[in-house]
Each structure stands twice: as C-alpha cells, then as structure tokens.
Amino acid sequence: MLRYIFFAAILFFVFPNTESAGFLKFELTADRDCLLHLEHSSTYSETVRLLAYESRPLEIYTQGSINEIPVHFQLLHHFSGKALSEAKFQIFQLKNNGLWDSKVIDTDKVILSVRSTFYCENGYFGPICDRRSRTFAPKSDIQTSTPGYQTQVLKFDFKISDDIIIYSSLAFFVLLLIIFNCILCCYRPKKSQKYLDVSLGSPKVFSICGYSADKSGNTTEYLDAPSRFFSSTKIECVV
C-alpha cells in the first residue's frame, strides 16, 4: 500500500500541471489615419488610433495551455468611428522562437500591416513558455566607516528550472523508497534454522570398555574412546 502512495506522489511531482504565459506583441502600420478595434475572446478588447505609416506597438497577454489564438481586427474611421471594414480574424502562433510573422489585411479603404512575435512572461521559458523558473537574487552591501566608500560583497543571480526540480523530487522519492525497503528488511523477524551436515554421516556411539587378549605369549591391549563424530583407538602392545 505504501508503495502505491510513493508512486502516486512521484507522478504528482514529476508531471505537474503547467500552463504557458507570455505576450503576443504586435507592430501595427496603416496607410492612412484610422482606428483599429481588436478583440480576443471575451478577455481582451481594445481600440487604438493609428497614424498613417507610423508603427504602433501593442501587446496581448496570454495564459493557458494553448498554442495559438485568434484575434479579431476591425478598421474604423479615425474621427466618426464608422466601420471601414468588416471584422476579420487572424490566427497567431504562440511560439517563443524570436521570429516575427507578417500579415496584411487589405480592405477597400485601408491597408493594415500586422507584424507579430511571441515572448515569455518573466519567470517562464521554453518553446511555448510553459516552463517555470525560479530566480534567486540575494544582495548584500557592506559599508565601511570610510565616508563615500562602499563595497558590494555579494551579488549573484541563478535560476532553477522545472527540470531540476522534477529530477530532484524523483531522486528524493526513490531514495526514500530504498530506505523504507531497507528498514523493512532489517526489522523482519528472524527464523531459527537448523542445518544438518550430511557429509558426517550418522553419529556413532562407542562404549568405554577395556579388554586384553593374549596370543602366543604376546599381550595386546585395546582402548576405545567415545566421540560424537569419530572414534579413535589406542593400541598398546606388550611383548
């Protein structure tokens, strides 16, 4: 049961729910003065003024597990706000590759050039900005007693990516699982076992007895000693 809990915890930390976060940046240029109304779903709606042949930067914040977004464009008269064209939507890819994509919206009265690129929000990185990074920037300044003299002792920045956190969590839980198994093996009750060495054969029992025999004037005395595993015989001859 505990192993299933460990595996579930590992899966939770190794495969966390992540979402992308970044900005879709536009450079808008029209060939005449006009108003441009932009809409993205129900979360974004804005109207900006464009001057003839002047680029206007604009950014749309995006968040979620998406790879592309549709944006509606509608050109309006710069003074009355009357529609100069129907609302048209364009689809933009959310790829953090540093490249600019160009589109042209051509109407009867206004030609609109749309250049777009996508970049990550601070703290995110990756091809679609779906990986988080944690930045640590501890700073410490030490001032000496000498007026006008300051010494900066420590200033460093480093990032810990999601991959490092994932691998560290996985290694920690694997180590914890190994320790748990070792504890189970150490505290397992020991069973007494008896071993019988079959190579020794069945034990022999000898009785302690002494006897002598006379033959042809010679006396031979035999003494037997008991032993559990072997027997020894001492022979003494008296001539």
Swiss-Prot record:
UniProt KW Metal-binding keyword: no
The entry's note on the tissues where this protein occurs is: Expressed in mesendodermal precursor cells of embryos.
GO BP terms, alphabetized = mesendoderm development
The yes or no answer to whether the keyword Cell inner membrane is present is no
Q: Which InterPro entries match?
A: Mesendoderm_Regulator (IPR053132)
Would you say which domain of life the source belongs to? Answer: Eukaryota
Q: Which UniProt keywords apply?
A: Developmental protein
Q: What does this protein do?
A: May have a role in mesendoderm development during embryogenesis.
Q: What else is known?
A: Down-regulated in 12-cell embryos from mutant worms lacking skn-1.
From the Swiss-Prot or TrEMBL record, give the protein name: Skn-1 dependent zygotic transcript 1 protein
State the organism named in the record.
Caenorhabditis elegans
User: What gene is behind this protein?
Assistant: sdz-1
